[in-house]
Curated annotation (Swiss-Prot):
Involved in oxygen transport from the lung to the various peripheral tissues. InterPro entries: Globin, Globin-like_sf, Globin/Proto, Hemoglobin_a-typ, Hemoglobin_oxygen_transport, Hemoglobin_pi. One of its GO terms (biological process) is hydrogen peroxide catabolic process. This is Hemoglobin subunit alpha-1. Red blood cells. It comes from Bubalus bubalis.
């Protein structure tokens, strides 16, 4: 999915407002995903998945760091996320549908924390961005 100039601007502006909360929002999105889609827990059998657990917070920080990197490389998502794509495809073998579920949970989390900034245009741009990230992360499954 190609991001337009307006999409890129919207994504950068929205992620800029996330600021220092990125790791917290990442953890919150994971918690939302685990609660809303319990089958996603199967990829984390060694995690304490309770609210506020250090492991969920740590993985949320990793998710946030990857998205921050992606926002900084909107013109080269495949290059920026190549190692992460390899990890999820070849080592972790995460079912690709889970990226869509996490993307949805991230959108809900961002909408709840940035209600005044989460316009329909920003929502659409973030959705396209997360779909693009998901496409890159699943590109090496073939």
């Amino acid at each position: 999915m190609v991001l337009s100039a307006a999409d890129k601007s919207n994504v950068q502006a929205a992620w800029g407002k996330v600021g220092g909360h990125a790791a917290d929002y990442g953890a919150e999105a994971l918690e939302r995903m685990f609660l809303s889609f319990p089958t996603t827990k199967t990829y984390f059998p060694h995690f304490d998945l309770s609210h506020g657990s250090a492991q969920v917070k740590g993985h949320g920080a990793k998710v946030a760091a990857a998205l921050t990197k992606a926002v900084g490389h909107l013109d080269d998502l495949p290059g920026a996320l190549s190692e992460l794509s390899d990890l999820h495809a070849h080592k972790l073998r995460v079912d690709p549908v889970n990226f869509k579920l996490l993307s949805h949970s991230l959108l809900v989390t961002l909408a709840s924390h940035l209600p005044n900034d989460f316009t329909p245009a920003v929502h659409a741009s973030l959705d396209k961005f997360l779909a693009s990230v998901s496409t890159v992360l699943t590109s090496k499954y073939r």
